[in-house]
């Protein structure tokens, strides 16, 4: 029985899953919108939202926690210098998932996951 087991396995072992979501979280923070499968987008939301909440309070300890979870100084800098102040007045719900059809090869449901208040330069780059 799978009672009280949260999270999706996504046909990966735990280290592969952790590395995949670490990379996807970095891409989402860097580009502010990415396209992926719907189940991955729903799980990625559980990784990215706590990072942004952490970035709302700038301290050395929080920066070290964010680095431990992302392993990328560029991502940590963007989280604390841009995203933390941008979402300071928002109490959660920093991401939006938009369904965008099905993948041609295997008919997997696809989705865009984006930060809700994207900056203008990333909106122009996405179009």
Curated annotation (Swiss-Prot):
GO molecular function: structural constituent of ribosome
Biological processes, Gene Ontology terms: translation
Name of one Pfam family that matches: Ribosomal_L17
Annotated keywords: Ribonucleoprotein, Ribosomal protein
GO cellular component: cytosolic large ribosomal subunit
Family that this chain belongs to: Belongs to the bacterial ribosomal protein bL17 family.
Classification via HAMAP family: Ribosomal_bL17
Subunit structure: Part of the 50S ribosomal subunit. Contacts protein L32.
The protein's name in its UniProt record: Large ribosomal subunit protein bL17
Species: Salmonella typhimurium (strain LT2 / SGSC1412 / ATCC 700720)
């Amino acid at each position: 029985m799978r009672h009280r087991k949260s999270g999706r396995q996504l046909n990966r072992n735990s280290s592969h899953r952790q590395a995949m979501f670490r990379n996807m979280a970095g891409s989402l923070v860097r580009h502010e919108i990415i396209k992926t499968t719907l189940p991955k987008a729903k799980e990625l939301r559980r990784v990215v939202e706590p990072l942004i909440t952490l970035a709302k309070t700038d301290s050395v300890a929080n920066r070290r926690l964010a680095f431990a979870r992302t392993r990328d100084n560029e991502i940590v800098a963007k989280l604390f210098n841009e995203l933390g102040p941008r979402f300071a007045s928002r109490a959660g719900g920093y991401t939006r998932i938009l369904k965008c059809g099905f993948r041609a090869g295997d008919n997997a449901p696809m989705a865009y996951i984006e930060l809700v208040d994207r900056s203008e330069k990333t909106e122009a780059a996405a179009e």
